[in-house]
C-alpha cells in the first residue's frame, strides 16, 4: 500500500465511522425489530401487517410531495434573486435564511400555533379589521401541516440551489443572449439544466424529512392527521 492510498483512507475514515454509526447501525436495528416480535423471536407478522398503515403512508407521501413542490416554487426564484445581488447583500440574505436553522426545531414549529390558533395573530387581526366575525379554523388542518413543513424545510431547498446557481458561468448566459435566446429559452436551455443538481439535492433534503416527520403533524395537524412518523411513534 503506497502512502497516497493510505493517506486517502485515513482522511476518509471519519466519514466511514460516521456512516457506520449513524446510517448502517440504525438500519440493522430497524431490520431486527421488523423481523422479530416483542420477545425477540423471528416473525414476518410486522411485514405482513404493513397494509394496515397504507393510509398513513399515502397521506405522508402526499403531504411531503405537496410541501416539496411548494418549497421548490418558492426557493428557486429566491435563490435566483440572491445571485443577482451584490456580494454584501447576498451574505445578508444568506444569514437571514440560516438564522431560523439555528433555532430549535420544536420552537420554530410551536410558534405557528400562536399564529394560526383561534386567538392567534391572523384571526385576531382579521377580526379587528372587520373581515371576519368569528375565528377561521387554521390550526389542526392539513394546510397547517403543509405550511409547517414548508417553513421548517425551505432553507434546505434554498441553500443547495443557491450554491449551484452562484457558480454558474456567466459567459454561458451571455452566449445564450448573443444567440437570440429570450429569458424563458435561456432559463429552459441553460439555467435550469445547470442548476438541476442543486434542485435534486434540495428535493431530497426536503422530501425525506417531510415524509417522516411527526412533530409538525402532531402540533399543527392534531390527532386527525396521522402521518407515518406519528404511527411509528405511537
Tell me what each language-model feature is.
Residues 3-7, 44-56, 214-234:
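Interhelical loop and adjacent transmembrane-helix boundary motif
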Residues 32-69, 135, 234:
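Periplasmic/extracellular loop-to-transmembrane helix junction in inner-membrane transport proteins
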Residues 30, 157, 198-233:
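Non-cytoplasmic
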Residues 14-23, 69, 99, 151, ...:
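Transmembrane alpha-helices
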Residues 1-29, 91:
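N-terminal signal-anchor/first transmembrane alpha helix
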Residues 24-32, 73-78, 106-110, 119, ...:
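Membrane-embedded alpha-helices of multi-pass transport/permease systems
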Residues 109-150, 184, 220-224:
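Membrane-interfacial helix termini and adjacent extracytoplasmic/periplasmic loops
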Amino acid at each position: 500500500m503506497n502512502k497516497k492510498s493510505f493517506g486517502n483512507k485515513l482522511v476518509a475514515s471519519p466519514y466511514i465511522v460516521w456512516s457506520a454509526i449513524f446510517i448502517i447501525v440504525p438500519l440493522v436495528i430497524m431490520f431486527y425489530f421488523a423481523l422479530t416480535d416483542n420477545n425477540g423471536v423471528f416473525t414476518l407478522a410486522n411485514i405482513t401487517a404493513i397494509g394496515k398503515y397504507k393510509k398513513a403512508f399515502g397521506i405522508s407521501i402526499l403531504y411531503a410531495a405537496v410541501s416539496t413542490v411548494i418549497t421548490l416554487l418558492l426557493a428557486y426564484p429566491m435563490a435566483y434573486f440572491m445571485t443577482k445581488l451584490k456580494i454584501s447583500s447576498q451574505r445578508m440574505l444568506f444569514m437571514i435564511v440560516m438564522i431560523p436553522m439555528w433555532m430549535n426545531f420544536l420552537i420554530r414549529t410551536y410558534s405557528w400555533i400562536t399564529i394560526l390558533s383561534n386567538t392567534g395573530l391572523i384571526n385576531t387581526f382579521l377580526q379587528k379589521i372587520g373581515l371576519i366575525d368569528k375565528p377561521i379554523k387554521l390550526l389542526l388542518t392539513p394546510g397547517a401541516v403543509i405550511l409547517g413543513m414548508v417553513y421548517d424545510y425551505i432553507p434546505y431547498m434554498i441553500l443547495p440551489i443557491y450554491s449551484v446557481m452562484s457558480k454558474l458561468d456567466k459567459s454561458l448566459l451571455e452566449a445564450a443572449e448573443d444567440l437570440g435566446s429570450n429569458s424563458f429559452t435561456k432559463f429552459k436551455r441553460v439555467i435550469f439544466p445547470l442548476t438541476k443538481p442543486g434542485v435534486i439535492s434540495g428535493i431530497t433534503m426536503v422530501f425525506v424529512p417531510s415524509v417522516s416527520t411527526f412533530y409538525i403533524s402532531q402540533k399543527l395537524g392534531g390527532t386527525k392527521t396521522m402521518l407515518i412518523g406519528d404511527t411509528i411513534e405511537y
